[in-house]
C-alpha cells in the first residue's frame, strides 16, 4: 500500500523521495512522495517538499534507504514511526480488518507494538473510530488531501496534496516528513508546508505543519493525540501532511485523535477524518482523556444549558451545578417545571405514592400511633429524610419516630414534624413516598435511608412533591388541627395531626389520602392539591395524587434544582470565574467592611433562590400548603393558618391549636384573600400592608403559583414547615418562617393574626417578594414588621431574643435557639442569627440569624436562618444550610437572600438588630424596607457572625478563631486564622519590650531587618518636638509612628493561611480599615484603653464603644453598616469584648490622654499620619496584649468587633501606633482622619495616604 511506501517513508520513498524527497527535503517527504507513489510522487515531490517547489527537484541528495531508516530511528519526531511501521500497519490492517487510520492510531497508542496494537484495535479502539471524521474538513484541505489521497492513495494523497503534505505524508518517515515539512517546508515549500500552504493537502501546510506542532499541541491538549504530545500526532502534525494527507485538511487536525497516524490512508482518512471525526475521535480517545471542551471554562455554562437550564432555574450557577453533578441528578432539569417538588422523584416513585402515602399514613398513624402521637415524629419526605442527617432506624416505630425525630430535630422536616407532627399521617405520607404502604417504622427507616441516600441537596432547593406534600400535610394537618372543621379532609386530618396517634388518624388516612395525593399536587401547586386538601374529592378531582406525582416526577428535576440550590463546587471554576450565586459576587463587591462582608446581601442570588426555592420550594412546600389552603381556600384557609403550626412544630402546633380556633376563624376569612392567611392574620399586619392584601390576593395567586411559598406564609407557618421543608426554606423566606414558626407560635400566642400576618404577610409578600425584589415582601415585611412588632412580639419573643440575638448574632449561640422558628433544628436555637450558626443543623435558619428572631417574616430571614441553620438535613435549610454551611456558601446569602431579603427587612422591622442579622442579602431588601438602615450593609454581613475581626486580635494574640460564619469563601480564608504569620502584625521576632527609649521609633531591633534605620522619611524629630509633649518624649518620638520602623506585613498577606482580604472577594485588606476617625473624635472611633492603661486589660473597659459603636455607625463605615448594623447592637458585642466596664474606656481614655496629643497633628511627624502607624507590630509599643498598647488591648477589645469591619486591627494600630497611642488620639486622627477616611474607601489604610 502506498502506506508501505510511506512507511518506507524515506526508504520506500527512495525513488519517489528523490522526486518528492528532494522537494520534501527529507526522506520523510520522500516517503510520502514515494507513498504518493509515482503519481503523487512527483506531486509529492513538489508538494511534499512543502518546499517541493523549491526542493522537489532537488533529487540530488536523496537519503539512502539506510540513511532514512537511521534518520527515522533516530528522529524523535518520527518517534514511533520506525521504518517498519508501514509494514506493521499493513499487517495490522490485514489482521484486524481495520482501516489504516485506526491501525495507525492503534500503533501510535501502543508505541508501535503490534500485539498491543491488535488488542487495542480489537478491544479499545471502536470500529470506525475515524470513519466519521472523514468529511468534516474535507472541504479545503481535505479536498486537496482527498484529491491527493485519491491520487496517491491514502498516503500518497497526503504527499501530493501538499508539497508539505507529501512530506508530511511520509508514512514511515513521519519524522522526516515532519522535519522535512519543517525543513523542506521551511526551506522548500516553507511557505506551503510551513505556512500551511494549501499545498499541504490544501490544508494550509502551515496549519498542518504548524499543524504538526499544532497537532502536537493538540495532542498535548489531549484533543488529538491525547497521548503523545507530538509523537503520533506530532508526527501526524509533522506529518501533518501525512495526517493531513489523507485526512488532510480537517482530517489531519480533525483527526487529531487517533488518526494522528491518520495521515495514512490520507485519502480515505480524509474521508474518515473530518474535523467532525476529530471530535468524534477526540470523543473516543479524548473521551477517556478530556472533554472536547477541555479548554473552556464555559463548559460549565454549556453543560448547564445542556442540562436544559431553565431560565427560571437558570442560575448559571445553579444549573451548572446540575450539570456537574450529573451523577447526582435525580431528574432532568428539562422536566423541571415549577419549582414544585424538588424531590419529586422521591415522591414521584409512583403515581400511587399518594395512595401509598395514604396507606402509609393510615398504617403509620394506625400502625404507629406512638409515632403519630409524637408530634415531632413525622416521617420526613424522602428528600427531607435524606436531609435528616441521622436516619438510622432503631426500631420500627422508633425508627419512624427517631427518623421523624431525627428528621424533625435535624431537619426542616423537624420543623414540619414538630409542627406537622400532628399528622403522623403526614409523616407516613412522606414515608409513603418512600413507600406509602409501610406503616412500619422499619420501612420508614428504609425510606429515610433511601431519602438520605438521595442527594440531600435536592430537598433543599425545593421541596420534592413528596416533601411538599409532607410539609403541606403537616401544615395542613396543623391547619386542620386548628380549623379541623374547616376542611373536611383537613378537619379529619387535624385530629390526626393533633392527636398524632388519634384514631382520627384513621380518618386522617382517608383525609390524608385525600390530602396526600393533593400534597403531591401541592407540589404541583395546582388547585388540585388545594382541592385535595379541601377534601378527598378535591384530591380525587385533582387526581392530584397521580397528577401531582406526575408533577412531582416532573418536578423531580426541580429536586435537581435543589441540587442547584446548593451547587457543589463545579469542576470548572464557575464560581471562581463568576462567584457562585450573586451572593458570593456580592462579596466580591468588595464591600470593604471586612467584618461586615456582604455575604449574600446580593439579592440576585436571592432571586435565584427565590425563584428556585420560593418558586419551587415555596411552591412545593408553601405552595402546597397554600394551595391546600388556597385550593381548599375555603376551609383550607384554616389550613393556611394551620400551617404555621407545623412550623412551630409541636409547640406552635399546640399553641396554634390553642390559638387556632381564633385563627381558624380568621382563616376562613382569609381564605378569600389568601387561603393561607387567616383573616386575623391578614388583619393585623396584613391589613397593615396593602401588600398583604395584595399578597392575600397574590397569595391566592402567586402563592398558589410560585410562591406558594409565599402563600406559605400562613402557609408559612406551615412554611416553617416548609422551612422544615427544604424548599420551605425559601418559602420560609416567603413565609417568613419565623412567622411561620413563630408566627404559628405567634398565632398561638398572638392569635392567628400574628401568625398569619407574618406568615401571610410575609409569606405572601415573600412569595411575591422573594422572587421579586422582596421589597414588597418587605413592605410586607415592614408591615410584617409591624405585625411582628405588634402582635408578633409576644410570640416573637424569640425574635426579640433574636434581636438580642442580633447582639447575639455575632454570638452564634444566641438564643436564637429560642426561636421556634428554628423549629427544626433550630427549635432550640433562638431564631437569632446566632441561632443559625449554632444551629447549623437545620432550620436553624437564618431565620435565626436573620431575624428569625425578627420573627418577622423572618422566616424569610429564617430562611436565611435556614441557610444559616444550614441544617443540612432540612434541605430547605439546606439552602440555608448551604449558607450556613460554608459549603453552601453562596447559598448563604442566597438562602438568606431570598429569605434574607425578606428576612432582612423583616428582621429590620422586627429589630434593627435582626436586620443586621438578617443582614444578609436581605440587606437590599431590608434596605428597601425597614431598617433598610440596616442595613444593607448590615445585611451584607451576616450579623450572626461574630465577625470580630478575625484578623489580628492582638499582637501576640493568635488569631482568635472565630466560628463566625462567613461565606463559604470567607470560611476558606478564615479557617486559616492562626497567628498567620506571626500574628500578622505580630512581629516574627520577639521585639524587646522597650525599643531603646520607651519604644523610640529609632530603637533598633537587631533582629529586624531595617529596624535600625531611622525613618529618614518620617523623622521622628518632629515627634519629639511634637505638641504631644505630654507623652514622654520618647513616646512622643515614637508617638507618631509608635513603633520601631518595621515594615508592616502586607495588608494583603497571603502567607499564614490568612489570605486576608485579597483572598476574599472583597479585597478588604487584612488590616481592618480604620474608620476615619475624624468623625469619631478622640476616643470615639475606637476607644482604646488609656494608652498606658496597662494593656487593654486595665482598660477594663473598652467602652461599650457606646460612643465608639455609635461612631461606627456614624463613620465611614456606615456603609459597612456594621455601625448601622448597629453598633448599638455592637455595643452588645462590646460586652462581648468584656473588656471591662465599658465606661472605663471612656473616650477620654483615647482621646485626650494628652491635651497636646489631641492637638498634635501627626500628619507629618507621625509618618503614619496618612497611614496608620504600623499596626503595632507585636513587640512594638506594647509588645503584648497586655501592654498598654492598644493593640494588645485589642485582645479584649476585639470581640467587640461585632462590627463587621475589623476595628481592632486597623483602628488601634492606626490610632495607637504606639502604646502611648499618641496617634490614636482621635482628634489628631480626626484631623488626619479626613485624609484617612479614604481608608474605608481604599480599604487599605495606606492607600489613602
Curated annotation (Swiss-Prot):
It is found in: Cytoplasm. Residues 84-124 form the UBA domain. Residues 7-30, 38-50, 186-209, 228-240, 248-269 have a biased composition (Gly residues). This is Protein lingerer. It comes from the Eukaryota. It comes from Anopheles gambiae (African malaria mosquito). Acts in the nervous system to mediate the control of copulatory organs during courtship. The gene is lig. Coiled coil: none annotated. Residues 1-66, 132-312, 350-375, 454-506, 549-579, 616-717, 738-922, 1016-1042, 1124-1149, 1164-1186, 1211-1249 are annotated as: Disordered. Residues 457-494, 678-705, 738-769, 777-809, 862-873, 1124-1138, 1216-1249 have a biased composition (Polar residues). The lineage of its organism: Eukaryota, Metazoa, Ecdysozoa, Arthropoda, Hexapoda. Pfam families: UBAP2-Lig (PF12478). GO terms for cellular component: cytoplasm; nucleus.
Amino acid at each position: 500500500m502506498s502506506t508501505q511506501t510511506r512507511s518506507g517513508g524515506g526508504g520506500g520513498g527512495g525513488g519517489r523521495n528523490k522526486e518528492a524527497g528532494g522537494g520534501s527535503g527529507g526522506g520523510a517527504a520522500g516517503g510520502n512522495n514515494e507513498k504518493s507513489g509515482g503519481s503523487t510522487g512527483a506531486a509529492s515531490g513538489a508538494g511534499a517538499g512543502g518546499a517541493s517547489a523549491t526542493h522537489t527537484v532537488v533529487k540530488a541528495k536523496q537519503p539512502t534507504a539506510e540513511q532514512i531508516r537511521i534518520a527515522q530511528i533516530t528522529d524523535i519526531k518520527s518517534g514511533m514511526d520506525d521504518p517498519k511501521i508501514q509494514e506493521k500497519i499493513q499487517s495490522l490492517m490485514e489482521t484486524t480488518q481495520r482501516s489504516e487510520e485506526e491501525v495507525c492510531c492503534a500503533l501510535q497508542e501502543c508505541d508501535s507494538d503490534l500485539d498491543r496494537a491488535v488488542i487495542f484495535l480489537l478491544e479499545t479502539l471502536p470500529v470506525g473510530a475515524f470513519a466519521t471524521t472523514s468529511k468534516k474538513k474535507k472541504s479545503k484541505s481535505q479536498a486537496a488531501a482527498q484529491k491527493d489521497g485519491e491520487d496517491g492513495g491514502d498516503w500518497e494523497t497526503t504527499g501530493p496534496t501538499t508539497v508539505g503534505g507529501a512530506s508530511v505524508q511520509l508514512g514511515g518517515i513521519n519524522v522526516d516528513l515532519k522535519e522535512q515539512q519543517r525543513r523542506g517546508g521551511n526551506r522548500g515549500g516553507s511557505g506551503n508546508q510551513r505556512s500551511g500552504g494549501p499545498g499541504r493537502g490544501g490544508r494550509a501546510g502551515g496549519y498542518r505543519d504548524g499543524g504538526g506542532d499544532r497537532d502536537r499541541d493538540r495532542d498535548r491538549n489531549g484533543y488529538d493525540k491525547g497521548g503523545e504530545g507530538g509523537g503520533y500526532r506530532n508526527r501526524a502534525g509533522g506529518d501533518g501532511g501525512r495526517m493531513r494527507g489523507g485526512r488532510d485538511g480537517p482530517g489531519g487536525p480533525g483527526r487529531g485523535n487517533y488518526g494522528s497516524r491518520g495521515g495514512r490512508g490520507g485519502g480515505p482518512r480524509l474521508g474518515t477524518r473530518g474535523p467532525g471525526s476529530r471530535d468524534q475521535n477526540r470523543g473516543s480517545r479524548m473521551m477517556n482523556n478530556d472533554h472536547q471542551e477541555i479548554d473552556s471554562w464555559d463548559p460549565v455554562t454549556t453543560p448547564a444549558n445542556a442540562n436544559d437550564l431553565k431560565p427560571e432555574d437558570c442560575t448559571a450557577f445553579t444549573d451548572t451545578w446540575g450539570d456537574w453533578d450529573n451523577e447526582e441528578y435525580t431528574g432532568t432539569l428539562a422536566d423541571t417545571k415549577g419549582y414544585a417538588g424538588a424531590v419529586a422523584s422521591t415522591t414521584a416513585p409512583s403515581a400511587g405514592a399518594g395512595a401509598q402515602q395514604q396507606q402509609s399514613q393510615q398504617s403509620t398513624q394506625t400502625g404507629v400511633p406512638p409515632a403519630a402521637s409524637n408530634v415531632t415524629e413525622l416521617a420526613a419526605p424522602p428528600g427531607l429524610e435524606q436531609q435528616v442527617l441521622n436516619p438510622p432506624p432503631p426500631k420500627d416505630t422508633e425508627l419512624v419516630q427517631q427518623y421523624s425525630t431525627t428528621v424533625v430535630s435535624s431537619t426542616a422536616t423537624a420543623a414540619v414534624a414538630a409542627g406537622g407532627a400532628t399528622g403522623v399521617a403526614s409523616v407516613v405520607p412522606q414515608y409513603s413516598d418512600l413507600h406509602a404502604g409501610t406503616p412500619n417504622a422499619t420501612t420508614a427507616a428504609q425510606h429515610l435511608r433511601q431519602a438520605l441516600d438521595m442527594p440531600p441537596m435536592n430537598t433543599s432547593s425545593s421541596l420534592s412533591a413528596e416533601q411538599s406534600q409532607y410539609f403541606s400535610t403537616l401544615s395542613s394537618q396543623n391547619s386542620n388541627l386548628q380549623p379541623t372543621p374547616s376542611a373536611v379532609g383537613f378537619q379529619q386530618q387535624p385530629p390526626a395531626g393533633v392527636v398524632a396517634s388519634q384514631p382520627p388518624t384513621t380518618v386522617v388516612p382517608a383525609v390524608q389520602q385525600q390530602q396526600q395525593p393533593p400534597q403531591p399536587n401541592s407540589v404541583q401547586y395546582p388547585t388540585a392539591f388545594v382541592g385535595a386538601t379541601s377534601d378527598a374529592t378535591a384530591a380525587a378531582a385533582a387526581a392530584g395524587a397521580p397528577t401531582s406525582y406526575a408533577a412531582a416526577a416532573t418536578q423531580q428535576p426541580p429536586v435537581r434544582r435543589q441540587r442547584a440550590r446548593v451547587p457543589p463546587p463545579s469542576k470548572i471554576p464557575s464560581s471562581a470565574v463568576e462567584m457562585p450565586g450573586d451572593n458570593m459576587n456580592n462579596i466580591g463587591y468588595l464591600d470593604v467592611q471586612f467584618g461586615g462582608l456582604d455575604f449574600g446581601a446580593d439579592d440576585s442570588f436571592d432571586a435565584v433562590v427565590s425563584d428556585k426555592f420560593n418558586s419551587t420550594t415555596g411552591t412545593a412546600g408553601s405552595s402546597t400548603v397554600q394551595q391546600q389552603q388556597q385550593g381548599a381556600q375555603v376551609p383550607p384557609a384554616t389550613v393556611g393558618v394551620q400551617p404555621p403550626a407545623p412550623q412551630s412544630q409541636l409547640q406552635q402546633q399546640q399553641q396554634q391549636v390553642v390559638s387556632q380556633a381564633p385563627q381558624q376563624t380568621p382563616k376562613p376569612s382569609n381564605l378569600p384573600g389568601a387561603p393561607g392567611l387567616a383573616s386575623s392574620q391578614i388583619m393585623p399586619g396584613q391589613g397593615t400592608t396593602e401588600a398583604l392584601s395584595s399578597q392575600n390576593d397574590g397569595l391566592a395567586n402567586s402563592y398558589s403559583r410560585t410562591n406558594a411559598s409565599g402563600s406559605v406564609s400562613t402557609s408559612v407557618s406551615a412554611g416553617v414547615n416548609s422551612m422544615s421543608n427544604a424548599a420551605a426554606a425559601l418559602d420560609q423566606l416567603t413565609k417568613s418562617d419565623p412567622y411561620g414558626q413563630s408566627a404559628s407560635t405567634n398565632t398561638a400566642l398572638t392569635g392567628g393574626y400574628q401568625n398569619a400576618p407574618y406568615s401571610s404577610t410575609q409569606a405572601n409578600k415573600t412569595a411575591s417578594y422573594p422572587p421579586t425584589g422582596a421589597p414588597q415582601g418587605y413592605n410586607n415585611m415592614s408591615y410584617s414588621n409591624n405585625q411582628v412588632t405588634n402582635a408578633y412580639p409576644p410570640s416573637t419573643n424569640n425574635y426579640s431574643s433574636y434581636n438580642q440575638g442580633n447582639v447575639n448574632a455575632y454570638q452564634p449561640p444566641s438564643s436564637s435557639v429560642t426561636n421556634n422558628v428554628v423549629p427544626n433544628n433550630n427549635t432550640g436555637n433562638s431564631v437569632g442569627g446566632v441561632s443559625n450558626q449554632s444551629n447549623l443543623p437545620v432550620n436553624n435558619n437564618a431565620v435565626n440569624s436573620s431575624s428569625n428572631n425578627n420573627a418577622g417574616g423572618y422566616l424569610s430571614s429564617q430562611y436565611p436562618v435556614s441557610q444559616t441553620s444550614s441544617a443540612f438535613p432540612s434541605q430547605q435549610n439546606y439552602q440555608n444550610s448551604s449558607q450556613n454551611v460554608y459549603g453552601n456558601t453562596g447559598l448563604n446569602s442566597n438562602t438568606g437572600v431570598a429569605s434574607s431579603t425578606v428576612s432582612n427587612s423583616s428582621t429590620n422591622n422586627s429589630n434593627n438588630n435582626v436586620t443586621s442579622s438578617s443582614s444578609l442579602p436581605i440587606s437590599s431588601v431590608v434596605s428597601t424596607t425597614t431598617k433598610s438602615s440596616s442595613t444593607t450593609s448590615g445585611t451584607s454581613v451576616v450579623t450572626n457572625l461574630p465577625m470580630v475581626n478575625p484578623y489580628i486580635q492582638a499582637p501576640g494574640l493568635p488569631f482568635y478563631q472565630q466560628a463566625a460564619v462567613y461565606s463559604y469563601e470567607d470560611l476558606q480564608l478564615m479557617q486559616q486564622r492562626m497567628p498567620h504569620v506571626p500574628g500578622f502584625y505580630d512581629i516574627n521576632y520577639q521585639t524587646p519590650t522597650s525599643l531603646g527609649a520607651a519604644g523610640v521609633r529609632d530603637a533598633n531591633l537587631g533582629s529586624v531587618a531595617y529596624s535600625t534605620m531611622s525613618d529618614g522619611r518620617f523623622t521622628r524629630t518632629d515627634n519629639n518636638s511634637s505638641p504631644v509633649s505630654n507623652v514622654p518624649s520618647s513616646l512622643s518620638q515614637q508617638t507618631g509612628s509608635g513603633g520601631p520602623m518595621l515594615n508592616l506585613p502586607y495588608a494583603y498577606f497571603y502567607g499564614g493561611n490568612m489570605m486576608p482580604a485579597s483572598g476574599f472577594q472583597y479585597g478588604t485588606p487584612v488590616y481592618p480599615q480604620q474608620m476615619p476617625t475624624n468623625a469619631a473624635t478622640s476616643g470615639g472611633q475606637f476607644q482604646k484603653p488609656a494608652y498606658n492603661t496597662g494593656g487593654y486589660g486595665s482598660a477594663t473597659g473598652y467602652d461599650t464603644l457606646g460612643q465608639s459603636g455609635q461612631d461606627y455607625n456614624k463613620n465611614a463605615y456606615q456603609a459597612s453598616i456594621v455601625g448601622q448594623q448597629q453598633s448599638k447592637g455592637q455595643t452588645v458585642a462590646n460586652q462581648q469584648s468584656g473588656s471591662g466596664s465599658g465606661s472605663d474606656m471612656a473616650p477620654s481614655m483615647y482621646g485626650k490622654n494628652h491635651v497636646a496629643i489631641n492637638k498634635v497633628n501627626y500628619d507629618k511627624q507621625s509618618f503614619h499620619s496618612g497611614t496608620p502607624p504600623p499596626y503595632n507590630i507585636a513587640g512594638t509599643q506594647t509588645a503584648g496584649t497586655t501592654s498598654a498598647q492598644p493593640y494588645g488591648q485589642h485582645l479584649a477589645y476585639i470581640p467587640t468587633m461585632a462590627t463587621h469591619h475589623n476595628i481592632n486591627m486597623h483602628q488601634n494600630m492606626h490610632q495607637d501606633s504606639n502604646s502611648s497611642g499618641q496617634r490614636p488620639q482621635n482628634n489628631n486622627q480626626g484631623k488626619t482622619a479626613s485624609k484617612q477616611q479614604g481608608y474605608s474607601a481604599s480599604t487599605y489604610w495606606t492607600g489613602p495616604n
